[in-house]
Amino acid sequence: MSTSRLYTLVLVLQPQRVLLGMKKRGFGAGRWNGFGGKVQEGETIEDGAKRELLEESGLSVDTLHKVGHISFEFVGSPELMDVHIFSADHVHGTPTESEEMRPQWFQLDQIPFADLWPDDSYWFPLLLQKKKFCGHFKFQDQDTILSYSLREVDSF
């Protein structure tokens, strides 16, 4: 890996449900995911997460809770994706479809894991248990995990 790029991912969690967005275009199109993207130059990771949540879902948030940090490697790509994962429980506004994402609430026992990124089934249970985690996933392509490591951490 020659370079890495900072990304954010925000999961809006409320009692018994989570807000996911159907990615409509670009990388990961056709999958449900949290809200996030690239951190822009001059922006903190948390500010980038808040901006992406607002742009993609129409929701604003006062407080984010950092819950995870995962690096993603894709065979053939020189760039490592350095993803900082946050949860938000109190948001302002109503989820609104954007050019990039179509938000939808899911009951926690009905999360569509078959239509999420394959790695989500490994770390999402930790998120729902309010545990913090770090990891690395190596993908052959967007559907195939070659190897991974994942561990709980006490704090960031």
From Swiss-Prot:
Subcellular location field: Cytoplasm; Nucleus; Nucleus membrane; Cytoplasmic vesicle, Secretory vesicle, Acrosome
Cofactor: Mg(2+)
Domain of life of the organism encoding this protein: Eukaryota
Residues given in the record as Mg(2+) 2 binding sites: E52, E55
Organism: Mus musculus
Positions annotated to bind 2-oxo-dATP: T8, N33, F35, G36, G37, K38, W117, P118, D119, D120
Ligand binding (8-oxo-dGTP): T8, K23, N33, F35, G36, G37, K38, E52, E56, E100, W117, P118, D119, D120
Disruption phenotype: Mutant mice appear normal, but have higher incidence of tumors in lung, liver and stomach.
Record's cofactor remark: Binds 2 Mg(2+) ion per subunit.
Record text on subunit structure and interactions: Monomer.
Chain span(s) of sequence motif Nudix box: 37-58
InterPro entries in the record: 8ODP, Nudix_hydrolase, NUDIX_hydrolase-like_dom_sf, NUDIX_hydrolase_CS, NUDIX_hydrolase_dom
Nudix hydrolase domain sequence ranges: 3-132
A GO cellular component entry from the record: cytoplasm
Tissue expression per record: High expression levels detected in thymus, liver, spleen, kidney, testis and large intestine, with lower levels detected in brain, heart, lung and stomach (at protein level). Expressed in kidney, liver and small intestine.
Function as written in the Swiss-Prot or TrEMBL entry: Oxidized purine nucleoside triphosphate hydrolase which is a prominent sanitizer of the oxidized nucleotide pool. Catalyzes the hydrolysis of 2-oxo-dATP (2-hydroxy-dATP) into 2-oxo-dAMP. Also has a significant hydrolase activity toward 2-oxo-ATP, 8-oxo-dGTP and 8-oxo-dATP. Through the hydrolysis of oxidized purine nucleoside triphosphates, prevents their incorporation into DNA and the subsequent transversions A:T to C:G and G:C to T:A. Also catalyzes the hydrolysis of methylated purine nucleoside triphosphate preventing their integration into DNA.
A molecular function (GO) term: 2-hydroxy-ATP hydrolase activity
Gene3D superfamilies: Nucleoside Triphosphate Pyrophosphohydrolase (3.90.79.10)
Family, as annotated: Belongs to the Nudix hydrolase family.
Catalytic activity: 2-oxo-dATP + H2O = 2-oxo-dAMP + diphosphate + H(+); 2-oxo-ATP + H2O = 2-oxo-AMP + diphosphate + H(+); 8-oxo-dGTP + H2O = 8-oxo-dGMP + diphosphate + H(+); 8-oxo-dATP + H2O = 8-oxo-dAMP + diphosphate + H(+)
Keywords: Cytoplasm, Cytoplasmic vesicle, Hydrolase, Magnesium, Membrane, Metal-binding, Nucleus, RNA-binding
EC class: hydrolase
Protein name per Swiss-Prot or TrEMBL: Oxidized purine nucleoside triphosphate hydrolase
